Amino acid sequence: VHLTPEEKNAVTTLWGKVNVDEVGGEALGRLLVVYPWTQRFFDSFGDLSSPAAVMGNPKVKAHGKKVLGAFSDGLNHLDNLKGTFAQLSELHCDKLHVDPENFKLLGNVLVCVLAHHFGKEFTPQVQAAYQKVVAGVANALAHKYH
């Protein structure tokens, strides 16, 4: 992902304030609520029968934290996202058979959750930088698909 120095600074500065546990669970939960067909990848997570059940589900929260941990790692390797996410791309493609379009959906949901959490601090410039990053991460995660 090509970011200007200003964009990179905006992304890393805001990310330093992100509560990965909270935002990860909320982002994954919102994905599962807004795009219910994505729930099929999470059969083992138990009750996903309502928005309240999804948002309160400890397995959703735990996996959301894990997802955002990987995203954090990607922020440290913006110049090599494909390499950083190669194993996760392979896993999601070959073993889990996740539609790569879902990575874009999750990225967009993450941007919405960040905007919700940070309000005025999430300026149009910060949003534009994050849109570049989530698009780059989605592209890297889709890289191993054939």
UniProtKB/Swiss-Prot annotation:
Keywords noted in UniProt: Acetylation, Heme, Iron, Metal-binding, Oxygen transport, Phosphoprotein, S-nitrosylation, Transport
One GO CC term, this protein: blood microparticle
Residue numbers carrying N-acetylvaline: V1
Tagged with keyword Nucleotidyltransferase: no
GO process terms (BP): hydrogen peroxide catabolic process
Tissues where the protein occurs: Red blood cells.
PROSITE patterns from the UniProt entry: GLOBIN
GO molecular function per UniProt: haptoglobin binding; heme binding; hemoglobin alpha binding; metal ion binding; organic acid binding; oxygen binding; oxygen carrier activity; peroxidase activity
UniProt modified residues of type Phosphoserine: S44
Domain annotation Globin: ranges: 2-146
PTM sites of type N6-acetyllysine: K59, K82, K144
Keyword tRNA-binding belongs to the record: no
Residues annotated with Phosphothreonine modification: T12
Record PTM S-nitrosocysteine, positions in chain: C93
Protein residues bound to heme b: H63, H92
Role, per record: Involved in oxygen transport from the lung to the various peripheral tissues.
Family: Belongs to the globin family.
Subunit comment: Heterotetramer of two alpha chains and two beta chains.
Name of the protein in question: Hemoglobin subunit beta
Organism this protein belongs to: Theropithecus gelada (Gelada baboon)
Gene, per the UniProt record: HBB
